[in-house]
A protein has these predicted regions:
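Acyl-donor (CoA/ACP) binding surface of acyl/acetyltransferases
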Residues: 3, 20-48, 55-56, 91, ...
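An amphipathic alpha-helix signature
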Residues: 44-51, 73, 77, 81
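Hydrophobic helix-cap positions at the C-terminus of alpha-helices
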Residues: 53, 82-84, 144
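Short helix-loop boundary/capping segments at the starts of domains
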Residues: 56-59, 85
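Conserved GNAT-fold acetyl-CoA-binding loop/helix
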Residues: 58-79
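A short helix-loop-beta-strand connector motif used in the catalytic cores of GNAT acetyltransferases and
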Residues: 81-93
Length: 220
């Protein structure tokens, strides 16, 4: 059972509320929703669920970085309050269309000069599959190339993360670079997806596939 969220200060609560009001302008229209999932802007109350994912080794074992301590709901709320003010990031929750259940995160970081890094993970892994991660990627690509006017989206994936690489290929991403990351102590693959590829609908070429991601395309 998720813990009750208690913002640590009135200031943090006001900051989060202001952030949420500003981010409403970025809400995706309902035509982005498919029969399985939709994405919506992250909210402060999502910390009640996401702090549990931050403490799950199964989610973080395939990523380039991971938490270095146990994360409490208060710590997660403080982190979200800061993150949601960043102008170079856009963060969304992945939710089931039938009941609104929050099952994962998808987001852009390092948004600058027409480029952004994509991250995605399914936190509730028992609810993975059925093309849900793929659908979320297609939706955030729509948002990135239309609302943010991006030219390129890229993802960095550990070579060993077979599920993430399969998801990237199904979404039309092209493998362009391999290198060794000293920080992650692993071989890393860079995948890219361009505006031209989006206009040619390459992300839709393979349809919705059943990809059960373990960690997805790199949560932070």
């Amino acid at each position: 059972m998720a813990a009750t969220l208690k913002p640590d200060s009135d200031g943090a609560e006001r900051l989060a509320s202001s952030t949420i009001r500003r981010r409403r302008a970025y809400c995706l229209p309902r035509f982005y929703m498919n029969k399985e999932v939709y994405i919506r802007p992250l909210r402060l109350e999502d910390a009640q669920m996401s702090y549990q994912w931050r403490n799950s080794p199964k989610i973080w074992r395939h990523t380039l970085s991971k938490p270095d301590r146990h994360i409490t709901v208060e710590m997660e709320a403080e982190s979200l309050a800061r993150i949601l003010t960043r102008k170079d990031e856009k963060r969304f929750a992945i939710c089931l269309s039938d009941n609104g259940a929050y099952i994962g995160n998808i987001f852009y970081t390092d948004i600058r000069d027409g480029e952004a890094q994509l991250h995605i993970f399914i936190g509730e892994q028992r609810l993975g599959g059925k093309g849900r991660a793929y659908s979320a990627v297609c939706q955030i690509l729509d948002y990135g190339f239309n609302a943010l006017k991006l030219e390129t989206v890229y993802a960095l994936v550990k070579e060993e993360n077979l599920a993430a690489k399969a998801l990237g290929r199904r979404a039309g991403f092209k493998r362009v670079l391999e290198y060794y990351s000293n920080e992650a102590r692993a071989n890393v693959v860079r995948f890219v997806f361009t505006k031209l590829m989006y206009e040619q609908k390459e992300h839709l070429g393979m349809g919705i596939s059943d990809v059960r991601g373990r960690g997805g395309l790199l949560p932070e």
